[in-house]
């Protein structure tokens, strides 16, 4: 599923961000390696937030000066719940912010330990070479801090969308392989109807 989601996320993404789409997809479900989550698959009624695990792992492995680490951890941690508030350094693990979630490492020990993924699945954070095109894009507008923030936010939302679509469709392909996808309809007629209604 991680590889399938990574392939789809890259297909949906613009060239500039394809390496990031691949990374978030490969990290997004590593929390499912935890025994607690495996028990859920076997029918146990247990609660387990697997999405945070990938974000914690990514943050631990990434270069701490990498400007894209927050972007990628936002996407990974929120792939089921949506992009959350960033929070602040003083947030606690109980807070529902990204800063709070990333402090929950102690929650993932014992049967909640997900790090067994490392025994069979090799995943690495962004390299300097992979992030260079996106960094160059941000630096091209560095004289306008507002524009830098706008592009950073756009990149985050685009990556998040690529991940959630890819995750859903790869899961659907496994669970319901006969599902037909694609848009159908007479778009020319729909446009005519829309234009007519706006002209009334």
Stretches found by the model and what they are:
Residues 1-197:
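Accessory nucleic-acid engagement/destabilization modules that flank
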